């Protein structure tokens, strides 16, 4: 989730179908009169691209249970943040079983994603890029794709570039990747040169600062 996806605005960005419960002040009277169908004003935040959070569940990528639990906590925190911001977010989680929940905003949808994370295990064996290749048809062009993973190496770089070349906006949240300061700096520069957003999170407490842009 990048700051580009979190801007709040009251500026009208377009017109959408009327949804039961919309306030009268939201009705777009001109569009309704022209089409004969109820229309509502769409604001900038509502029209922002959808976001998919991918949790890396490959067993060999983690040093142990605590390492994976940190990744799960980061993914859960990202979803909580998205819910507070009223963003349309989805979840991709592939281990022994594959789960893909399309981006949505309903509270029930967020509860379903969080419920999945509670029982998620690091029981996968497929490389990141293979997981993406098998599911790329589900991702809308222009969507934000956030990978939560401990990988910060050539395999991850190629996966991020592969996503980017398919008209999505990749972001990596590297969870306790074990990079020293020099290696982390080189990794950041390499991704930044490609326009890829990168956050390094070694502890869950660092995530709020990262979301605020301080770790990019």
PLM ranges: what are they?
Residues 122-216:
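Von Willebrand factor type A / integrin I
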């Amino acid at each position: 989730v990048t700051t580009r996806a979190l801007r709040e605005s009251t500026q009208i960005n377009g017109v959408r179908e009327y949804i039961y419960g919309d306030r009268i002040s939201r009705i777009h009277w001109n569009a309704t009169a022209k089409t004969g169908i109820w229309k509502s004003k769409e604001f900038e935040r509502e029209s922002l691209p959808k976001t998919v959070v991918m949790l890396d569940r490959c067993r060999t990528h983690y040093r142990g249970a605590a390492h994976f639990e940190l990744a799960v906590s980061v993914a859960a925190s990202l979803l909580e943040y998205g819910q507070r911001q009223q963003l349309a977010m989805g979840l991709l989680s592939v281990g022994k079983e594959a789960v893909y929940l399309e981006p949505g905003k309903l509270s029930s949808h967020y509860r379903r994603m969080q419920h999945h994370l509670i029982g998620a295990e690091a029981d996968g064996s497929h490389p990141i890029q293979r997981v993406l290749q098998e599911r790329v048809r589900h991702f809308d062009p222009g969507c934000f794709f956030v990978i939560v993973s401990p990988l910060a190496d050539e395999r991850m770089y190629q996966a991020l570039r592969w996503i980017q070349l398919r008209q999505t906006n990749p972001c990596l949240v590297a969870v306790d990747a074990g990079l020293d300061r020099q290696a982390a700096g080189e990794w950041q520069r390499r991704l930044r040169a490609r326009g890829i957003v990168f956050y390094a999170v070694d502890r869950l407490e660092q995530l709020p600062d990262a979301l605020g842009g301080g770790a990019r």
